[in-house]
Amino acid sequence: YSTQYIIQIGVIEIESNKKDSLFWNTNRLIPLTIEESADYSRKDSIYTVRNSKKYLDSIDAKGNKFKLGKVLTGYTFKNSAEKYSLSYEGLLNIGSLSFNTVQGYNFDSGFRFTSTKNQESKGIYTAVSTKFNYGFAEERLRVTGQFLHRFNKMNYATLSISGGSSVKQFNPNEPISKVINTISSLAFRNNFMKLYNLEALAISYSQDIANGVHLNGKVEYQQRKPLFNNTDFSFLNKSDLYSSNNPLDLNDFTTAPVDKHHLTKATLNARINFGNNYSSRPDGKFNIRNEKYPTLYLGYEKGFASNEKKYEFDHLNTRLTYDLILGSKGVLGLNLKAGKFFNAENIAFMDYKHFNGNQTHIGQSERYLNVFNLLPYYSNSTNNSYFELHSEYNDKGYIMNKIPLLNKLKSTLNLGFH
């Protein structure tokens, strides 16, 4: 990893904004004009007022008013002077309402505490949150919690501890959104989302270990349990049948896709931004990715300490992403992935490598560099070696702007290969 092309684009020294007028009169090459001096003085006065405790408390007092209805809709208490907030999502968190055939209708609520007291000077950030999820068809409440602490914004050292009970898709990338699955299930009885129960406790740590190099390590204890359909409800197409919750056999409603078991997983991932530039300020180091160079991801995953030896495995993986800028002719995006499993002949299905498919045929992103839009979700899942390629060309108007009438639409041409 060469540092030849690393550039520090800018630097602001510590407490440079606290120098007195004598310092600036001595070191400023070109004196400020009268208008500039007046403008700086005015802005300093405004900043002082708007950051005073009296002003901040008055603003908070208006937003912090509590009404009984907030129990249902949610409530946030802010203390801007002390730089912390406490939020509650409410019992009627309509935005979280969704449907799947395991839980039926389900919704989330929760609490979250955040503190940014030393954010400006040191970049310290702390968040403690808990989420409650209730499934009506299951009649079951699941609870998860997380503690997250960022130590600074120089190397972005971050510690996270999380745990609890939740439902998870077999593909950890979760290619099927809750909204899309709700619509496809209730309107068309296409329940593409397949779920299992996860009870876990995890600790992770990440930081920049060199310019452009970010490292993340995680150890997680997991207990996995199979789940089955608990509802047959839909609005339309009631004569059709839902598929089972078994991604290995959609017509098998009695056999579990996995047996109940536990496993400890350790992962180590690195991200390398080649040619990474950055800017230094008193409150942190801010990375500026150099678009001339690709980004490389390296990963190692190990499953161990299981109740059955067959679930243990090793998995090496890598990914390369790159946007080739073609000047006025557009952009060619690339996403290459490869990996290999070892000692993984009988591992659990959720530990397989799953490829992001899309059986709903509804696009969910502006670019399709991480999805196969015609692939069934679990048809090509593997516990062996694999290679994956996505490429997409966007002409940025280079071709479309030359076609009469179509050029009036300001549209772009996209061509993909997967």
Labelled PLM ranges:
Residues 1-19:
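Gly/Pro-enriched, hydrophobic low-complexity segments
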Residues 20-103, 110, 175-328, 414-416:
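Transmembrane beta-strand segments of outer-membrane beta-barrel domains in Gram-negative
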Residues 84-99, 115-117, 122-147, 161, ...:
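Transmembrane beta-strand segments that form the barrel wall of outer-membrane beta-barrel proteins
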Residues 117-126, 153-159, 212-215, 225-226, ...:
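Repeated loop/turn-to-beta-strand initiation elements of outer-membrane beta-barrel proteins
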Residues 147-153:
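Short, surface-exposed basic-aromatic patches at helix termini and helix-loop junctions that form
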Residues 153-163, 169, 236-243:
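Long amphipathic alpha-helical scaffold regions
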Residues 158-179, 183-194, 255-256, 297-401:
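C-terminal outer-membrane beta-barrel translocator/porin domains of Gram-negative envelope proteins
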Residues 403-413:
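Membrane-helix boundary/juxtamembrane motif in polytopic membrane proteins
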